[in-house]
């Protein structure tokens, strides 16, 4: 029965998120008015989520070349980096923000599933998962609901799928109350000769859909992700996909076995925009690679979960756990047999053509006929450069009180209880971090997560990071710091930083101040990546992260989340974060100008982050990274932990108590600290960049100092590790003294209390 379709006109195009200029361009491309199905195809492919139309011009300024890169940014489903021994790492980070705002459990779960599919469609087996999460204040009951749903969704999907969740970060700021951020990262390993391209090539080659049946879930999910959240967004729960980790596990194993047959010519995940994006993007890559390509697909052959689905619905469905395969002609039955073995559907639905078009048949009629390149990023999709106007942060400078008027000991303990500082144990204990048995240390015991690479002596380090408060206060410095802190964490673990992926979360790009934040923070990221020789392999842009919750429309803090990988040539060089041995000397690398601007302490004590971010010296950061890796290779570092959120006091406290099986204490005396009235606050709580606290054997001090001098990194001994308890002095004057027990109680219980006992700590 023929589906009755609405009349296609400018008004209907506007309902699909297309402006008048874009609708006119579609008519010019086709030479006619589009069909309803074609309008739907253009609307999702030209959405911000798929086309990057407001961001691609800026993204092209990032460094995208490096000796170890095997694919360029955006060329495939994920970045691919050579790590030697005929092995490569595939890795990528993506957002699932809007779905998680309206349906936190499924939104987060399908975010995890989708990013893993991007990895194994390249032939790589996922070996690790990380995440980066942002929520509003834990005082808000809905925020607690969102946190619970997101954490359970990540944990349930990852645990069931069998990939360890080894790291991540979580922050709480009021600006995320109505618009949480859920960024998921997957890392996989593949032998060079087993990689697969997301390309449609070989005229006459059969095209197969494998995996789950197609339903009505997720229709216009890409469009939903390309608009502002509002109170009406709750009505868009049908745009949120529903995931099945057990189905994806079967799909993974079947796909890797199918690739091993040698009969898979091309492979693409069906993520945003489903069949539409996979057919369009694979066709366009075929044209780019060979000069011709295209796919003709018959929707009558697509396994449908629901009866009576229209061509529009089938093409735009974002049902999960599906992929598109181009098989070598004559071997499609071999591919189908592999999937049947794993009880996974595999059906031939079309063929590769050479006419450079995506053609869609339904009930014997041609319902879409579109030039493939007109649909995709880098082809005919629109590209815009928006107005960018800098705006001073809407925050006040802090009126600091002299040290003498403050109970700094009480404030230090209170700082440990802050949700942004306190242990995230309640979160990561819901994740299986040890499945696959490659995870080297428990979560949080190293500054970067590290897994062993089987069959080699190597280790793979990985980290996600971004302090969005810094980016809000100073987009250029904040973008640089996001990359620098990731690299610093990688180096603290003993690994050399290799490359990054990014997930750029911002507000509405049509607002000049938001586009300025985006453009300027990307510039900062690029500066840092060039300084560290860590090219960008790809990633994701998520605009329109604004909401009407809280009495007015407001954008989130600009949040360019960085995902980074690094390599340990010898896993025995791994360095942990925590103190290891009583009697060790405590050393501080780095000696920047200390100020409280942007710090968690300043927000807690003075109610404002101030008006600027910490300073950042990229050359010093690179020197520090090289020094840390050198010291790890020389087996001179017993531990290393970077100074970041909460400042030096929090770093020392974490080093003392983070290994719950072996807690130690410290005695530290900070000398030559000047005479300013705020010097103790600045020494203990400044988040000045480029600093790391390490521990070494006392007799190694000379060798370490000499190596630091060779690397042009300031270093000084500030104390020693003791069996228990802690004391901190500034210029010989006792300021703080703690028991191990009270540090532990403050740090480990606070977040769970805040989330479940309605206490904002």
Swiss-Prot record:
Residues binding ATP: 52, 92, 502, 539
One Gene Ontology cellular component: cytoplasm
Pfam family, one: FGAR-AT_linker
Primary location recorded for the protein, binned into one broad class: cytoplasm
Active site: 49, 96
Binding-site residues for Mg(2+) 2, renumbered to this chain: 118, 269
Gene Ontology biological process: 'de novo' IMP biosynthetic process
Binding site for substrate: 95-98, 117, 241, 318-320, 542
Gene Ontology MF terms: ATP binding; magnesium ion binding; phosphoribosylformylglycinamidine synthase activity
Domain of life: Bacteria
Binding-site residues, Mg(2+) 1: 94, 540
Subcellular location: Cytoplasm
Subunit-level organization: Monomer. Part of the FGAM synthase complex composed of 1 PurL, 1 PurQ and 2 PurS subunits.
Function: Part of the phosphoribosylformylglycinamidine synthase complex involved in the purines biosynthetic pathway. Catalyzes the ATP-dependent conversion of formylglycinamide ribonucleotide (FGAR) and glutamine to yield formylglycinamidine ribonucleotide (FGAM) and glutamate. The FGAM synthase complex is composed of three subunits. PurQ produces an ammonia molecule by converting glutamine to glutamate. PurL transfers the ammonia molecule to FGAR to form FGAM in an ATP-dependent manner.
HAMAP family named in the record: PurL_2
The protein, known as: Phosphoribosylformylglycinamidine synthase subunit PurL
